[in-house]
């Protein structure tokens, strides 16, 4: 399941359970209400995609249909007055991937670092405007596949954690990567969010207890 936020509403798309690969869209608002409007349903079921909002449109990138990883970029215009639009394939991403990250800063979209074929980590790219042209960003040889990342506005950096439990910083001003802390455990999935300058990391695993930690970039120099 992937998620994105637009005008105080969270959009949750696709996902998988034991039997079904989902195509539905669930919407959560600040009144603590859930809805599932059918007009937002995806053209086909997918899981492991990433979603984001860019210029009043909702996007879904990549994911898997259960047989193959995808590279489609789907767009739904959220600015429609009546709320009824459609999903359109607007571009192809440079890699077929599942997982990975998408981060929007200003007019640019940064995406990639998901899991490609045979579990190999995909690259990292940036784009803008129509999202049809993606420019590659060099990445460290040792970085693994990434499932979550955050933007630190004060440092103008992305912080992300790979599937080895390694935290990485990518500074947008200098274009430099810095290897940060290595967590003392590996988990199947990581989720990150940032609040008041502190990064919170939830590690999830099928066989071990979940881990929840606080990470302050200022400490990690």
Whereabouts are the PLM-identified features?
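Kelch-like beta-propeller repeat domains
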Residues: 1-221
């Amino acid at each position: 399941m992937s998620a994105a936020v637009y005008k105080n509403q969270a959009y949750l798309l696709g996902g998988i359970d034991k039997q079904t690969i989902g195509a539905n869209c669930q919407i959560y608002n600040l009144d603590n209400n859930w809805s599932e409007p059918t007009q937002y349903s995806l053209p086909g079921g997918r899981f492991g995609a990433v979603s984001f909002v860019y210029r009043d449109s909702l996007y879904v990138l990549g994911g898997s249909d259960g047989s193959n990883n995808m590279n489609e970029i789907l767009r739904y215009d959220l600015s429609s007055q009546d709320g009824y639009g459609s999903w359109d394939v607007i571009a192809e991403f440079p890699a077929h991937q599942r997982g990975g990250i998408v981060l929007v800063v200003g007019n640019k979209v940064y995406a990639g670092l998901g899991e490609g074929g045979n579990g190999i980590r995909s690259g990292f790219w940036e784009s803008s405007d129509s999202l049809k042209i993606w420019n590659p960003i060099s990445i460290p040889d040792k970085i693994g596949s990434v499932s979550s990342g955050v933007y630190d506005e004060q440092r103008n950096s992305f912080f992300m954690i790979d599937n080895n439990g390694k935290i990485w910083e990518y500074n947008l001003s200098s274009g430099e990567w810095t290897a940060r802390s290595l967590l003392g455990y590996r988990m199947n999935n990581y989720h990150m969010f940032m609040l008041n300058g502190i990064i919170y990391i939830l590690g999830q695993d099928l066989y071990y207890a979940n881990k929840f930690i606080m990470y302050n970039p200022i400490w990690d120099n």
